[in-house]
């Protein structure tokens, strides 16, 4: 059966995560219902995503695949499915892909951004869309601590107790911290992420930025492989799934020919 890939963006503020759940409003359920209406069938069209996002987490570039015999032009998929979606979810592009393409398992890497507002007063115009820290932060100390996380490590200290991953080893390729006016933009790219890994890393970095822990605390916590020794999980508000990287042979809708699917909505 022919396979389609779709690129999505969504505001996660009003959704209880990506994954379908009984009696809950999720992005997956809403998308699959819209796909079924577009295809003119009862029920839903099952999808597989590149990365499941939690309650309150946003996506500037989520990728899904689905199998369907429906033949439409790419632009018809975009406009047609969006006609049945709420304003907080939108298909950005659609493209036929080979049968061996898998939105999750074909991905080489995922990139997340965390948008943090620095200010004495919470930012009402960014409510639900940016994290907030009212205390002064030592950005250089956070950058030094972040460097200890790069490479392949056992990230058990930064995984949720509900994490279902078969093993905790991940390769973190990038962890940048950029100052953009009142914002700090954290960019993290890895082959894959554990459940709550980004938010747990954020919590630890802020402990160091606020001077509550020294820079040397980060590699010690990483080496301990014990979630109890790390910082609390930080808020979901400012977290965005922002890019997915696939092998170039799939010729997806990337912006630079590298296979890295980027979004016009992010700060990257």
UniProtKB/Swiss-Prot annotation:
Species this protein is from: Bordetella petrii (strain ATCC BAA-461 / DSM 12804 / CCUG 43448)
Active site location: 54
Family: Belongs to the tRNA pseudouridine synthase TruA family.
Subunit structure: Homodimer.
Protein name: tRNA pseudouridine synthase A
Superkingdom of source: Bacteria
Residue positions binding substrate: 112
A Pfam entry, by short name: PseudoU_synth_1
